[in-house]
């Protein structure tokens, strides 16, 4: 075992003495057992993580019962909702790399034999997965589970996005401050990851398709007693994985990546999933090109529409309808779409995991013969405005905005854009351009939930598009095109756009262009002053110097 490095031989007496002092090693026999890290992300700032301390306790008990010695440690975490719309959002994506580094550091420094990862919200799941793949010790994931949707006294179903959009409605006088207060009180009724198919839930669902989590991981509610049972079962699997030396790079293969992307497309997951899955692939040293998503989308039906794409369905409804296993079972009817022989941490193949699944509600999970769309709910757009690609959540775009041409309204930061939208500068037909908010320019590629919610709240969702080298919350909806690559800070064409330039977004054609010739774009970019970083010290300054483009997952450079 790896852990023998710190526990075997007379020269390791000091190490054993310290391990005994932790209270986790209680008998001499414990030194012959696998040492398992319980990588928790409990903290009291994130509603999706406030309950994870109890799940950690359950996981430790399960590991002991299975014959291992558990050691719990924590990672940091950022609540994207609380960080939204201010400087804190610049730290959100950047926190993913800190989490990956933290996992690597603890596992390698203490020679752990295996990991049980307990994430829940946006950057924590991919960060832990990146760290696990880097160390390549056996691992199983079990998330904290989704939040239940809220309900107003009148019976209307609401969630966090309802609150953000209500701010825009309040600013126009469509609703009163008292009505806004009602939505605020009801939008987030308890612990768990926010209740729609936002980034956190998207990633936790993808864990099932990737093979790293047990069935139910993505959809069983945080407050459901079945969540505790799932934690116990998942943690109980790790000893078998350690003994059989089943490593994460054996689980994460190119075909399991394609399985996950197919699920993502079928349920219209967050655009952030593309960013994170590319980063995960990078850690596993798998080649996966941004453009392949469109080829996969062409044969993947969009069969499960969840908030924010609709206000009628939330994650709890997906669970009631059969969960992720039911979606995958339905997708397996499309010849050649899924590799059902892919291995998983259950010890069974993906096909065996979903064999008994069935769709229990066709209003939530449609058949592949009658999908919402014959193509997937995410797409990559190319053109002279995004030579290296940009991402849009097609499943959350209204039919009226699938093709749109309009004049650019350019803002060099998110704050200016929010002000412009809220004070009425943005008009019907405009294409809002928010730039210098990419991985390097932001820095940290902040999410644009506040401006997209303001557009929706002010009644412009069917007439205004928004493009950015930043990214979007999984809760954003509308004609929102993000991850524009190259970013403005790297002098991509988005840096050349001026207010009034005509921009065409053609989602069916996977195209996004600005009505400028190549020479004009070149001349405008050459005339720009040298890009000056917004933050010059601390972690974000270091991050900005090392981060790569969104089309490669915004991972950090490893070639110095």
From Swiss-Prot:
Does the UniProt entry include the keyword Iron? yes
* GO biological-process terms attached to the record: isoleucine biosynthetic process; L-valine biosynthetic process
Which keywords has UniProt assigned to this entry? 2Fe-2S, Amino-acid biosynthesis, Branched-chain amino acid biosynthesis, Iron, Iron-sulfur, Lyase, Magnesium, Metal-binding
UniProt pathway: Amino-acid biosynthesis; L-isoleucine biosynthesis; L-isoleucine from 2-oxobutanoate: step 3/4; Amino-acid biosynthesis; L-valine biosynthesis; L-valine from pyruvate: step 3/4
Residues binding [2Fe-2S] cluster, per UniProt: 121, 194
Q: What's one Pfam family the UniProt record gives for this protein?
A: ILV_EDD_C
E.C. numbers: 4.2.1.9
The record ties this protein, via HAMAP family, to: IlvD
Its protein name is Dihydroxy-acid dehydratase
Q: Which organism is it from?
A: Chlorobaculum tepidum (strain ATCC 49652 / DSM 12025 / NBRC 103806 / TLS) (Chlorobium tepidum)
């Amino acid at each position: 075992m790896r852990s023998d490095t710190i526990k075997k031989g007379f020269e390791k007496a000091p190490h054993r003495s310290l391990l005994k002092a932790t209270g986790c090693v209680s008998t001499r026999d414990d030194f012959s057992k696998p040492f398992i890290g319980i990588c928790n992300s409990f903290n009291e700032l994130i509603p999706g993580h406030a309950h994870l301390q109890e799940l950690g306790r359950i996981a430790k008990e399960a590991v002991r019962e299975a014959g291992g010695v558990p050691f719990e440690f924590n990672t940091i975490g950022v609540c994207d909702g609380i960080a939204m719309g201010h400087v804190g959002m610049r730290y959100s994506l950047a926190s993913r790399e800190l989490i990956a580094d933290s996992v690597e550091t603890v596992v390698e420094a203490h020679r752990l034999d295996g990991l049980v990862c307990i994430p829940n919200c946006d950057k924590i799941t991919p960060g832990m997965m990146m760290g696990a793949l880097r160390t390549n010790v056996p691992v199983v994931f079990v998330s904290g589970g989704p939040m239940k949707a809220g309900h107003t006294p009148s019976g209307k179903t609401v969630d966090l996005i309802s609150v953000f959009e209500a701010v825009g409605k309040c600013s126009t006088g469509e609703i009163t401050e008292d009505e806004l207060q009602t939505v605020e009180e009801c939008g987030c009724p308890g612990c768990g990851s926010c209740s729609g198919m936002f980034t956190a839930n998207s990633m936790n669902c993808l864990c099932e398709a990737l093979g790293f989590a047990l069935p139910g991981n993505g959809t069983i509610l945080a407050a459901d007693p079945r969540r505790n049972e799932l934690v116990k079962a998942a943690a109980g699997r790790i000893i078998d994985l350690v003994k059989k030396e089943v490593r994460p790079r054996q689980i994460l293969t190119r075909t399991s990546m394609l399985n996950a992307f197919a699920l993502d497309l079928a349920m219209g997951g967050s655009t952030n999933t593309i960013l994170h899955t590319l980063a995960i692939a990078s850690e596993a040293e798998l080649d996966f090109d941004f453009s392949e998503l469109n080829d996969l989308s062409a044969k993947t039906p969009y069969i499960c529409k969840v908030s924010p794409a609709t206000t009628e369905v939330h994650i709890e409804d997906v669970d009631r309808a059969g969960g992720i296993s039911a979606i995958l079972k339905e997708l397996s009817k499309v010849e050649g779409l899924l590799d059902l022989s892919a291995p998983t941490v259950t010890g069974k193949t993906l096909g065996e995991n979903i064999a008994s699944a069935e769709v229990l509600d066709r209003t939530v999970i449609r058949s592949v013969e009658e999908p919402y769309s014959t193509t997937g709910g995410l797409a990559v757009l190319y053109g002279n405005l995004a030579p290296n690609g940009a991402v849009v959540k097609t499943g959350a775009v209204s039919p009226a905005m699938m093709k749109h041409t309009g004049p650019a309204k350019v803002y060099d930061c998110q704050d200016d854009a929010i002000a412009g939208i809220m004070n009425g500068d943005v008009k019907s037909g405009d294409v809002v351009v928010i730039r210098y908010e990419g991985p390097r320019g932001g820095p940290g590629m902040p999410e644009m939930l506040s401006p997209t919610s303001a557009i929706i709240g002010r009644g412009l969702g069917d007439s205004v598009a928004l493009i950015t080298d930043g990214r979007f919350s999984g809760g954003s909806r509308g004609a929102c095109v993000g991850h524009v690559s190259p970013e403005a800070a790297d002098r991509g064409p988005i840096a050349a756009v001026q207010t009034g330039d005509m921009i065409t977004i053609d989602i069916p054609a996977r195209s996004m262009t600005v009505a400028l010739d190549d020479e004009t774009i070149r001349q405008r970019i050459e005339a720009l002053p040298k890009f000056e970083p917004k933050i010059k010290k601390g972690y974000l300054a270091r991050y900005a110097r090392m981060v790569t483009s969104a089309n490669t997952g915004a991972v950090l450079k490893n070639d110095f």
